[in-house]
């Protein structure tokens, strides 16, 4: 029998982890408390450093049975007055100061021991002799040869379970909660593998120590957050665009369509356009960490910037790529827009430009390039045959490149070596065609309901004009259908829709009988997730 939990007394934790970012918070709240990048940094660690951490962590064990110096025996009967007098006398002398200092040192050593113990448990990979770092502050801090890697692969499935466990622990620490005291709800993509589902289940019970667990589908949660039991969920994420039909709360898997031309494909298109459309005035995207100083310049003129050459030489390619992608992503969110009608060069030329300033001081009004890049979603054929470097580091400020990377930028063109198609390959189809293909793949009786309940979510769906363009194209391609697109105007609701749906679900009293309990996990193993979480 499944474990039954009361809805009123349980305060569940919700973690919604995507390829780009992960959201952590409490069930029943209307926004996540913590949003973290779904990446981790790692550097090598020596045996001596590991031994030092073990030495610090050992203090927690050795001191657990030791009475803290500040503790004293409780006064008995009428001795309270005498004890208070002695304490006052001692505090006024050197003995009191020494005792206070000793207690302070003891607490400091305990805190360090606890931190070292957690570092050894979550952050240190003894086999590969490396230490991991998670969180915005750690990933933004420059370290020589720090590598940055994604926790999830391009399909949104778990790539590094140890790094994800560390990310979850970091997020839960930010909430100041003990994971062993709260049920945990995790989310997953509709195409998640059996192996990945079992890894997540093991992580919840074995690593985090959760008393109960549930794995919910991200698309169903987005539909639930929109208040629709049946809908077509369009998720424009960082690496994938997917259209998923949901009828009465169940995914119709034969109607799932997805392509890898998501937000990062738009970033690649923007980067390509900048380097091929700006000319000599634009020398490259310069991340913040290499800038020593800069001066203001007029719009459209080259940046006047002094770089930290030791950081240019000392940064790894993955660290450089990560930070250049952050700059390009901010550029996209600030200026990118979708043309309201199918792509037309003349119409794009007449649209007004939008000002943007890069970290190195280069600024200008950007016009056609900010419109053309978003066509990756609707007209991917426009970008067929155009390659952009897989590593954003290939287009770092040209003047800062070490000689070994000089071939990456040659005469203003991006090298095709190690390149990937901007639009995710020739097989990609436009977003409107994906919607029609998904709906046509389901039963005829369900189609009208899906046309009238299209839910648009995902961080990259916030690009201006995307919803209007999709509505226009669907109206042209399916003129006899009543089409209604639900796209929340609230940024939080659209960007974090699956987390919000999970928050609502996990707070319902009727849901708590569905949790997988620790006892059930111990009896049936991780495979129970396939039977209980469908």
From Swiss-Prot:
Choose any GO biological process term that the UniProt entry carries and state it: DNA repair
**Homology family:** Belongs to the actin family. ARP4 subfamily.
| Function of the molecule | Chromatin interaction component of the NuA4 histone acetyltransferase complex which is involved in transcriptional activation of selected genes principally by acetylation of nucleosomal histone H4 and H2A. The NuA4 complex is also involved in DNA repair. Is required for NuA4 complex integrity. Component of the SWR1 complex which mediates the ATP-dependent exchange of histone H2A for the H2A variant HZT1 leading to transcriptional regulation of selected genes by chromatin remodeling. Component of the INO80 complex which remodels chromatin by shifting nucleosomes and is involved in DNA repair.
Name the gene: ARP4
Q: A GO molecular function for this record?
A: chromatin binding
Instruction: Give the source species.
Output: Mycosarcoma maydis
Q: Which Pfam families match?
A: Actin
* The keyword DNA repair belongs to this UniProt entry's keyword annotation: yes
Q: How does it assemble?
A: Component of the NuA4 histone acetyltransferase complex, of the INO80 chromatin remodeling complex, and of the SWR1 chromatin remodeling complex.
Keyword match Transmembrane helix = no
Under which name does UniProt file this protein? Actin-related protein 4
Query: How is this protein annotated for GO cellular component?
Result: NuA4 histone acetyltransferase complex; SWI/SNF complex
Check the record and name the InterPro entries matching this protein: Actin, Actin_CS, ATPase_NBD
- Provide the alphabetized UniProt keywords: Activator, Chromatin regulator, DNA damage, DNA repair, Nucleus, Transcription, Transcription regulation
| Cell location | Nucleus
Region of interest (Disordered), ranges: 59-116
Q: Which Gene3D superfamilies match?
A: 3.30.420.40, Actin, Chain A, domain 4
């Amino acid at each position: 029998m499944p474990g039954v939990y009361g809805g009123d007394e349980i305060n569940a934790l919700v973690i919604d982890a995507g390829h780009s970012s992960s959201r952590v918070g409490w069930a029943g709240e209307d926004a996540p408390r913590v949003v973290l990048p779904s990446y981790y940094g790692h550097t090598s660690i020596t045996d001596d450093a590991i031994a030092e951490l073990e030495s610090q962590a050992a203090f927690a064990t050795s001191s657990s049975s030791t009475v803290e110096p500040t503790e004293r025996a409780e006064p008995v009967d009428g001795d309270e007055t005498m004890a208070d007098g002695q304490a006052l006398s001692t505090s006024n002398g050197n003995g009191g100061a020494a005792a206070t200092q000793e207690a302070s040192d003891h607490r400091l050593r305990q805190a360090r021991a606890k931190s070292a113990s957690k570092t050894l448990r979550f952050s240190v990979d003894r086999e590969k002799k490396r230490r991991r770092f998670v969180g915005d502050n750690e990933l933004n801090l420059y370290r020589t040869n720090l590598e940055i890697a994604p926790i999830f692969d391009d399909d949104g499935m778990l790539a590094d379970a140890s790094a994800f466990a560390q990310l979850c622990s970091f997020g839960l620490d930010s909430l100041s909660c003990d994971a062993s005291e709260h049920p945990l709800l995790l989310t997953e993509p509709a195409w998640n593998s059996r192996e990945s589902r079992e890894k997540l289940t093991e992580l919840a019970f074995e690593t985090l120590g959760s008393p109960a667990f549930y794995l919910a589908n991200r698309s169903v949660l987005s539909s639930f957050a929109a208040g629709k039991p049946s809908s077509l969920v369009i998720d424009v994420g960082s690496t994938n665009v997917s259209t998923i039909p949901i009828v009465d709360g169940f995914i119709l898997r034969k109607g799932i369509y997805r392509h890898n031309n998501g937000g990062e494909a738009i970033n690649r298109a923007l980067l390509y356009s900048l380097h091929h459309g700006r000319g000599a005035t634009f020398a490259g995207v310069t991340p913040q960490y290499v800038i020593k100083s800069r001066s203001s310049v007029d719009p459209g003129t080259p940046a006047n910037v002094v770089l930290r050459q030791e950081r240019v030489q000392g940064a790894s390619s993955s660290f450089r790529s990560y930070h250049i992608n952050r700059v390009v992503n901010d550029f996209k969110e600030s200026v990118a827009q979708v043309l309201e009608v199918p792509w037309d060069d003349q119409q794009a030329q007449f649209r007004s430009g939008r000002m943007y300033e890069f970290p190195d001081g280069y600024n200008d009004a950007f016009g056609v390039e900010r419109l053309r890049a978003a066509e990756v979603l609707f007209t991917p054929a426009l970008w067929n045959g155009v390659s952009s470097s897989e590593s954003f580091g290939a287009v770092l400020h040209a003047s800062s490149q070490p000689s070994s990377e000089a071939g990456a930028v040659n005469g203003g063109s991006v090298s095709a070596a190690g390149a990937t198609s901007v639009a995710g390959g020739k097989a990609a189809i436009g977003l409107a065609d994906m919607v029609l293909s998904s709906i046509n793949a389901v039963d005829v009786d369900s189609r009208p309901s899906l046309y009238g309940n299209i839910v648009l979510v995902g961080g990259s769906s916030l690009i201006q004009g995307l919803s209007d363009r999709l509505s226009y194209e669907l109206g042209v391609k399916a003129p006899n259908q009543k089409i209604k697109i639900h796209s929340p105007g609230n940024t939080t609701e659209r960007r974090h829709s699956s987390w919000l749906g999970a928050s609502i679900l996990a707070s319902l009293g009727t849901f708590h009988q569905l949790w997988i309990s620790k006892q059930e996990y111990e009896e049936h193993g991780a495979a129970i997730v396939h039977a209980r979480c469908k």
